[in-house]
């Protein structure tokens, strides 16, 4: 039974997901349905958490919009996601960057990874 489930999950997984880590700045383009119209909406911010669970993988992106912190959790292999683009590589030493929630201004900056 588990082989059938694994086979179905493998078929549903996206192959074009770029490699990114916590601390990286990414731009996620998401399909949004408004009434009968369908359009792309970009959400750009810093990846603060990644949850690796195969087909059920997810990542959290945080940005500051009009002085207010906004976080959004995306399912990595969701058909709603059109594309993920890595804008900047960040150098951090933790897997979960939840401490950025309390920080503002210069203390919330992340150094750029050179490699």
UniProtKB/Swiss-Prot annotation:
InterPro entries in the cross-refs: Ribosomal_bL19, Ribosomal_bL19_CS, Ribosomal_bL19_sf, Translation_prot_SH3-like_sf
Top-level taxon in the UniProt lineage: Bacteria
Keywords on record: Ribonucleoprotein, Ribosomal protein
One matching Pfam family: Ribosomal_L19
General function of this protein: This protein is located at the 30S-50S ribosomal subunit interface and may play a role in the structure and function of the aminoacyl-tRNA binding site.
Protein name: Large ribosomal subunit protein bL19
GO cellular component, one term: cytosolic large ribosomal subunit
Annotated organism of origin: Pectobacterium atrosepticum (strain SCRI 1043 / ATCC BAA-672) (Erwinia carotovora subsp. atroseptica)
GO biological process: translation
UniProt family annotation: Belongs to the bacterial ribosomal protein bL19 family.
Gene3D superfamilies, A to Z: 2.30.30.790
A Gene Ontology molecular function term of the record: structural constituent of ribosome
